[in-house]
Curated annotation (Swiss-Prot):
Swiss-Prot/TrEMBL keywords: Copper, Disulfide bond, Glycoprotein, Metal-binding, Oxygen transport, Secreted, Transport
Disulfide bridge map: 52-63, 175-242, 335-342
Full protein name: Hemocyanin 2-c chain
Main location: secreted
Length: 420
């Protein structure tokens, strides 16, 4: 019974040696568990085998939700599913998180080291968090971490991913937040998995790499930070104040969590499979995070930092994104004056996808700030320039036929200022 014990989700770097050993033993046991509640079954929730829209359907697709306003809810349930499974296998704490918004030069040792010294057996054991096995294809997961993940900006500055998360946290409309939040999260999948076919950058097999759980515990923590910010701002935080409340998806069970116990044996996630029942994580799922600080900033300090950021005129590139049937890196450039002068890099982001995914199209733009890029080119809003993009697969090959529509240029005046 998980309903009466408060679980604390700790930063992976603050786990004690005993907690690390306990988590590893629990994951090792979970990976050996071939029942409906075992590792293979949970990992399949995100991709293969496909169970949606229902297991008996003639044409099925992966159940994972991307490009939709219920992305945070679906993945919050998935963290609870994993947390409960680890606790059933002996772990007594909460699902740890890897704070990838902070500067870093390597993956956490907890997930990167191939072996560890087990204090119980006094033996060197294989680290179950370094990879997982995909029974359906007979492969272990692998990683090809890209150098772009490792950034160490100076004091008072943020990594590229942290900047994208800050823009998400700035939004006080849930659906605006969700778009920025989800695209920022995509980077970790692509940067950790790289071009490896069985791992974090391949939608079918995301969840078979145990680092997924730490990544999504942090993704969920960032949603919790936004919720705390909303409460501080006097805005809705345990509901959605946007289009999600007008759609049936808000009131329908998220799958496969809402399916019967043959697919989902976890009573807790099945009983909370409707999105509106997922917001209040503290009461409904009985967990809290060790810290809701963002890069060392408390909620009040973070709010002040966001106000500081908004106190300047800013310019953004706007992309109305949709699924393209595969994962991709999108790079975009500023074109000065004429079409041939287009080699001025302005930014990049990742789209996640697969042929087996649910179709999606955002109903609002994803924004990427280009103020500094324009400043460096001595350009201003209203000058003669436009934006151009290129899409690449994760092997670096051009996806010339991908149509993401022409990016727009969005000017946002400093907060409190007025334009004619």
């Amino acid at each position: 019974d998980f309903g009466h014990s408060k679980k604390i989700r700790k930063n992976v770097h603050s786990l004690t040696a005993e907690e690390q050993n306990s988590l590893r033993r629990a994951m090792d046991d979970l990976q050996d568990d071939k029942t409906r509640g075992g590792f293979q079954q949970i990992a399949a929730f995100h991709g293969e085998p496909k169970w949606c829209p229902r297991p008996e359907a003639e044409k099925k697709f992966a159940c994972c939700v991307h490009g939709m306003a219920v992305f945070p809810h679906w993945h919050r349930l998935l963290t609870v599913q994993g947390e409960n499974a680890l606790r059933k296998h002996g772990f007594t704490g909460g699902l740890p998180y890897w704070d990838w918004t902070r500067p870093m030069s390597a993956l956490p040792h907890f997930v990167a080291d191939p072996t560890y010294d087990d204090s119980v057996s006094s033996l060197e054991e294989d680290n179950p968090y370094s990879h997982g096995h995909i029974d359906s294809v007979g492969h272990d997961t692998t990683r090809a971490v890209r150098d772009d993940l490792y950034q160490s900006p100076g004091f008072g500055h943020y990594t590229d991913i942290a900047k994208q998360v800050l823009l998400a946290l700035e939004q006080d409309d849930f659906c605006d937040f969700e778009v920025q939040f989800e695209i920022a999260h995509n980077s970790i999948h692509a940067l950790v998995g790289g071009n490896e076919p069985y791992g974090m950058s391949t939608l079918e097999y995301f969840l078979y790499d145990p680092i997924f759980f730490l990544h999504h515990s942090n993704t969920d923590r960032l949603w919790a930070i936004w919720q705390a910010l909303q409460k501080y701002r006097g805005k809705p935080y345990n509901t959605a104040n946007c289009a999600i409340v007008r759609h049936d998806t808000y009131r329908k069970p998220l799958q496969p969590f809402g399916l019967d116990s043959v697919i989902n044996p976890d009573d807790e996630t099945r009983e909370h499979s409707v999105p509106r029942d997922v917001f209040n994580y503290k009461d409904d799922f009985n967990y809290e995070y060790e810290s809701l600080n963002f890069n060392g900033l408390s909620i009040a300090q973070l709010d002040r930092e966001l106000q500081r950021i908004k106190s300047h005129d800013r310019v953004f590139a706007g992309f109305l994104l949709h699924e393209i049937g595969q994962s991709a890196l999108v790079k975009f450039y500023v074109c000065k004056h004429h079409v041939s002068d287009c080699d001025h890099y302005a930014g990049e982001f990742y789209i996640l996808g697969d042929e087996a995914e649910m179709p999606f199209a955002y109903d609002r733009v994803y924004k990427y700030e280009i103020s500094q890029a324009l400043h460096d080119l001595d350009l201003h809003v209203g000058d003669n320039f436009h934006l151009k993009y290129e899409a690449f697969n994760l092997n670096g090959g051009s996806l010339g036929g991908v149509d993401l529509s022409q990016p727009s240029v969005i000017f946002e005046p400093a907060a409190g200022s007025h334009t004619a």
